Structures are given as C-alpha cells and as structure tokens.
A protein has these predicted regions:
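Short, extreme N-terminal segment that most often corresponds to the first beta-strand
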Residues: 1-57, 66, 243-254
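Acidic, proline/glycine-rich low-complexity IDRs
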Residues: 164-165, 171-254
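Low-complexity, serine/threonine/proline-enriched polar segments
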Residues: 37-201
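Charged, low-complexity surface segments at secondary-structure and domain boundaries
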Residues: 4-13, 96-100, 121, 213-224
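Generic structural signal of hydrophobic/aromatic residues within well-ordered alpha-helices
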Residues: 18, 22-26, 135, 139, ...
C-alpha cells in the first residue's frame, strides 16, 4: 500500500460541482467498486483520495493576474482537518487555460540546458563511447559466451564512462546508476524536452474519457494503444487540453 499523485482531467464544470465531478470520475477505480452487469469491470486503484498540491511544490502555477478567478481550485483542509496554507500563485487545479505550465517548466529547462552544455564539454576529451544497451543486447543473445558481468565491465571500462563515474561534478549531471549516454541521447532540444516533460504530469493520469493511466508500469499505454515515454505522452496530453477543461491534482492511497 502506498501514496502517489494523480492528475484528473474533467470537462468544463462550475465551481460548485467540482467535488462531485471528481468523485464521479474516480468511482470506477475505487477498490470497493461493485461491478454491475453491463457496466465497467472492476479495476481498483485507490481506497482514499484528497485534492492536493497547491500548498507545496506539487501545485499548478497560476499568473498573479488570474488568482481571483473563482474557477481555480484549492481544498482548504487536509482529510484530518488540518488547515492548508496555499503557496502564492500555486493551486490544486483549475481550467487548463489558467494553469501556467511553462512557468513550472522554465527552471527545469534552464537546468537541463546547463547540464547538456556541461556534458558535451566533458565528452570532448574522450573517444566516443558505446551505450550500455549495446552490451546488454549482446549478452542477451549469448548469455553463456558473454555474461552480464562481462557486459557491465566492458561498458564501465570505456574511458568516457570511467571518467564520468570518477568525477563527482559530472556524476551530478545524470541520475545515479543510469547510462549517461542514454540519459543525454538525441539532440539538445530532445533532451530538454524529455526533462521538462517530467514537470507537469504525475505518475498517474485520469483522462477526460475516464482512462486511468499508470505511468509507473512498463505497459502503461496498453489500454489506450500507446507506447513509448509516458511523461512525453502525458505532458503533451495535458498541454493540449481545451482551455475550459479542468485539471486537478489529487493524492491517493492504494
């Protein structure tokens, strides 16, 4: 059992109907949902949830000029009754047109650009290295003749990878235990796009048509016929929602 964040997408809804609209969208995924003949199959995902985000870094940025709009969403208390203090210019949700996704992405884009520059500068002094995937595929095809331990040794034995892992400064440019060549793959623009796509989506997404997508699993797109990077999909989906549709962040327990 664990807690995680969910982004819920709703059709245009008046302020007084938001709580009921969220509850209706969430109902099919309740662990206690009772399957009815001809109705949706049981697909439990949660046993409790609450609106969440606008009192910390998980909230949606909103321009100060729009903060008086009554359609913006902020739940004033936690489930235990504790009062929440809203972070200025951050909300739990609201109409897509009022949520400034780019304001949230901007610092991440700047940091990604600097990481890209530093990595490219670092790699200039080394011969090109081969991504770990190449060694892993060779091991997969001939495990007896080329075991995984050998694949790892050959990958980490490359001068660039050895130097990168020996440099505390360079190690900070990419997540631990990842292949820096894979992390910085593609063009500068593609790298920044991947990094900024992590900002707005949560691990779980409930779409306008009622599809719960769990981005933490490998086959996240099975129900909707999609594959590839979940965050790129979810970020584009949220970006392109109609401006009057609501986007609300929840925390749920499963």
């Amino acid at each position: 059992m664990a807690r995680d964040l969910l982004t819920v997408c709703l059709p245009p809804t008046p302020p007084g109907g938001v709580t009921a609209a969220i509850a209706a969208a969430m109902a099919p995924y309740d662990y206690d949902f009772e399957e009815q003949p001809g109705g949706p199959a049981w697909q439990g995902e949660w046993d409790s949830w609450h609106v969440y985000g606008g009192h910390d870094g998980d909230g949606f940025p909103v321009s100060p000029a729009d903060e008086a709009d009554p359609r913006l969403i902020f739940e004033p208390t936690l489930p235990n009754g504790a009062v929440r203090q809203r972070t200025p210019s951050r909300w739990d949700g609201g109409p897509r047109a009022l949520l400034d996704f780019d304001a949230a992405r901007a610092p991440v884009a700047a940091r990604a650009a600097e990481h890209w520059r530093a990595w490219q500068e670092f790699t200039e002094g080394f011969p090109p290295a081969v991504p770990f995937d190449v060694f892993a595929e060779r091991a997969r095809q001939d495990l007896a003749g080329y075991p995984v331990a050998r694949a790892r040794a050959d990958y980490y034995g490359q001068p660039l990878i050895t130097a990168a892992n020996d440099s505390a400064e360079v190690c900070g440019l990419f997540p631990r235990l990842t292949d820096p060549l894979h992390h910085f793959r593609g063009t500068r623009a593609e790298f920044i796009r991947r990094e900024t796509a992590q900002v707005v989506p949560t691990n779980h997404l409930l779409t306008l048509d009622g599809q719960w997508i769990d981005g933490t699993v490998e086959d996240w797109g099975r129900r909707i016929g999609r594959s590839g990077d979940y965050h790129l999909f979810a970020d584009a989906y949220l970006e392109n929602l109609p401006g009057d549709c609501l986007v609300v962040r929840l925390r749920f327990h499963s």
